[in-house]
Amino acid sequence: MTDGAESPVAARVRAESRAWIEANWDPDLSLVEWRIRLADSGWACPSWPSRWCGRGLPASAADVVAEELSRAGAVGVPDGVGMRLAAPTLLEHGSDDLHSRLLRPTVTGEITWCQLFSEPGAGSDLAGLTTRAVRDGGEWVVNGQKVWNTSATHADYGLLVARTDWEVPKHRGITYFVIPMDQPGVEVRPLRQMNGHASFNEVFFDDARIPEANRVGEVGQGWAVALATLAHERRYAGMGPAAPSGAAGRATREAGAERAVVYEPYQWYPQRAGRVDLVVERATATGANRDPVVRQEIAQLLALARSAGWTAQRARAARSLGRPPGPEGSLGKLAASQVARAASRVHTLIAGASGMLDGPESPEDGTIAEIFVSVPAVSIAGGTDEIQHNIVGERVLGLPREPDPSHQLPFRDVAKNPSAWRDRPSGDKG
């Protein structure tokens, strides 16, 4: 929230939500039981319509309730693809049927989601995707491959963009779907990363089926829906680490049963790496703070972190005012990438050669090495830094787009020989 006196509406929301949380929060409840109680109250998503776990309040109410949940040490709504991407996209573009079937169980955590956008040949140029969906009666049959998907191993549903028309330019032949993941035609394979983890997956579709009722938006108009999802993704990336209630709103497994247990926030390494207080603490403990080069790197990290913080505040303020995601999300994501890279530099500078070690005898139990190998992903995931620069240049600075006549050709012609268009000077195309 921004500085200044709290509005009467915010004060009322704070008082009412605090009273309800104090009367109802019980850490001995199972996670699902608590989230069902929260959803029934309307405090789960206070700015949503009352029929979908909300209270029809202004968008700013969500931040107030999140603060009150955090103050009480209570669990909030699930944090991840479901609430960050799927729910807002469905609210904006989904049918009433999708709302009634999917919104509430997303809020309670009874269903989970993954995002199925990128392909081996369509990452930054997402509109060049070739996964196809063909109508078959009341269903769509999907064949193709997606990659770099988180949560796909355990997701119930996926947000899928697929090509349904090859005879029109690439942006106009895409349709957006909600695909059930638990079916014979969907195969998920984890991808091993250089840090030893398998946080991402590749997903293969072999005659997978989607009910017509799971289409989001009109046939061939999926690019606009996909842009809405990507805008929400950039907004959250630009807002920085999750708010305390978001970090508190995750669960651990205790004695074999899900319990609403609050755990230490900032456990994702790149986010934790950017905490300047932790960097200063380690530099002081090792004596590296006496090195002027280290002090200069810490000062630069502090400046970048402060700048990123102000950008994140702009993104949060825009959301609280109910504004649609804008270019501040791209600016925030770029700022987060800069902070992560600067943090990686100073951490490895402080640790020296020992920072390359892994295991219990390495600095911070291998955290330094983990930061070093994980941070590059921050500049790629959710849209590369180059894509964010393009968005800022075109939508903030008003710079012209690079000419690309292939955008006017039927995608079938472009897909047959993409290098012929990619390698020729723009003046020779067409």
Language model region names:
Residues M1-G80, L85, R101-P105, T112, ...:
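Amphipathic, small/basic residue-rich leader segments at the start of a protein or domain
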Residues V9, D26, N149, S330-G430:
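Alpha-helix capping/hinge segments and adjacent helical runs
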Residues D40-G109, S151-Y157, A305, A312, ...:
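Internal helix-loop-helix
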Residues T131-V134:
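A structural signal for short hydrophobic beta-strand segments in well-ordered beta-sheet cores
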Residues N143-L191, N201:
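A short core secondary-structure module
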Residues V186-R306, V378, N417-K429:
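Glycine-rich beta->alpha junctions and the first turn(s) of the following alpha-helix
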Residues R295-Q300, P327-L334:
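Short, charged, amphipathic alpha-helical segments
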